[in-house]
Curated annotation (Swiss-Prot):
This protein's record includes keyword Oxidoreductase: yes
UniProt name for this protein: Alcohol dehydrogenase 1
Subunit structure comment from the entry: Homodimer.
CDD domains according to UniProt: alcohol_DH_plants
Chief place of localization: cytoplasm
GO cellular component: cytosol
PROSITE patterns per UniProt: ADH_ZINC
Keyword ATP-binding assigned: no
Assigned protein family: Belongs to the zinc-containing alcohol dehydrogenase family.
Gene3D superfamilies according to UniProt: Medium-chain alcohol dehydrogenases, catalytic domain, NAD(P)-binding Rossmann-like Domain
Length: 379
């Protein structure tokens, strides 16, 4: 492309300080360096993780910053050493990477790349420790290696998944984070047998994706647990067959579930990060074969406490990161699930706004309205 090797001027939504509305600014985006890719973002969506770090609730607040990590785009140019991507390729950026060289990437059992594992503190590229974004010569920092709230962004090649060019980017862009995380937690980690009973704790986007995974796997009962009863009707679209609101009961949730299921559920997936819900999700699975999977990220000081007999009685507790999907290897296959109409992505998309109204997406998330809001970069 004519812009290859040159600085591109484009619009980006800059967070100048914590919890203040994003400002659409003209930024300069430097060309990709070795093992980097510059991508034209066409559609992006807002994830709770963006909001969490924008509010500076994360470890080390870094500002000014360009947030965004769920997106779909087209490769504009590639840096030296990039061989498996070319200008024009359709891609999904991913907040975690796959270098294909480290012990984790070479293991069939792990997706936690040593080189490109998520780092929320780092606001620069790993190659040279510099940002590719600037305004008047001053750096604007990156977020989780993606920064998709910009018309153009630069990423390490390991954080870019090449997908089927026929897949509509305005739909599959939501697969680059939360939806795949929930889906994979059920399909790849919990692995519910056909006809089994699955409990889903938390019915936000990730929990609904976990329910969708249970539906695809053929679970016969999918029990949604949430403190917000307003979420129950929507959750039926994702396969939930019944619901428990802990506020409606004067006994522990694990006891309620045991009574509903003749001793416990076969599988549970915890998507809230609330430490009590995590313990409940483990203690509600059936002895002998029950498996609980933790997806939600807990408070840094949280401690998981349960009696060791819960393990000795053959219950299994697992954790998962990004649904155990390797970004570059596996994400194209998740897109194909959508293309084959096995995965219904449209159900997750409840709102759409032009880039100029990106702050509306933040407002919707704060109000708890909808599931995913697509932000259209070109009006």
């Amino acid at each position: 492309m004519a812009t290859a090797g040159k600085v591109i001027k484009c619009k980006a939504a800059v967070a100048w300080e914590a919890a203040k509305p994003l400002v659409i600014e003209e930024v300069e985006v430097a060309p990709p360096q070795a093992m980097e890719v510059r991508v034209k973002i066409l559609f992006t969506s807002l994830c709770h993780t963006d909001v969490y770090f924008w509010e500076a609730k994360g470890q080390t607040p870094v500002f000014p910053r360009i947030f965004g990590h769920e997106a779909g785009g087209i490769v504009e140019s590639v840096g030296e050493g990039v061989t498996d991507l070319a200008p024009g390729d359709h891609v999904l950026p991913v907040f975690t990477g796959e270098c294909k060289e480290c012990a984790h990437c070479k293991s069939a059992e792990s997706n936690m790349c040593d080189l490109l594992r998520i780092n929320t503190d780092r606001g620069v590229m790993i190659g040279d420790g510099k940002s590719r974004f600037s305004i008047n010569g001053k750096p604007i920092y990156h977020f989780v290696g993606t920064s998709t709230f910009s018309e153009y962004t630069v990423m390490h090649v390991g954080c870019v998944a090449k997908i089927n060019p026929a897949a509509p980017l305005d739909k599959v862009c939501v697969l680059s984070c939360g939806i795949s995380t929930g889906l994979g937690a059920t399909i790849n980690v919990a692995k519910p047998p056909k006809g089994s009973t699955v409990a889903i704790f938390g019915l936000g986007a990730v929990g609904l994706a976990a329910a969708e995974g249970a539906r695809i796997a053929g679970a016969s009962r999918i029990i949604g647990i949430d403190l917000n009863a307003n979420r129950f009707e929507e959750a039926r679209k994702f396969g939930c067959t019944e619901f428990v609101n802990p506020k409606d009961h004067d006994k522990p949730v694990q006891q309620v579930l045991a009574e509903m299921t003749n001793g416990g559920v076969d599988r549970s997936v915890e998507c809230t990060g609330n430490i009590n819900a995590m313990i409940q999700a483990f203690e509600c699975v059936h002895d002998g074969w029950g498996v609980a999977v933790l997806v939600g990220v807990p408070h840094k000081d949280a401690e998981f406490k349960t009696h060791p007999m819960n393990f000795l009685n053959e219950r299994t507790l697992k954790g998962t990161f990004f649904g155990n999907y390797k970004p570059r290897t596996d994400l194209p296959n998740v897109v194909e699930l959508y293309m084959k109409k096995e995965l219904e992505v449209e159900k997750f998309i409840t709102h759409s706004v032009p880039f100029s109204e990106i702050n509306t997406a933040f407002d919707l998330m704060h109000k708890g309205e909808g599931i995913r809001c697509i932000i259209r970069m070109e009006n």
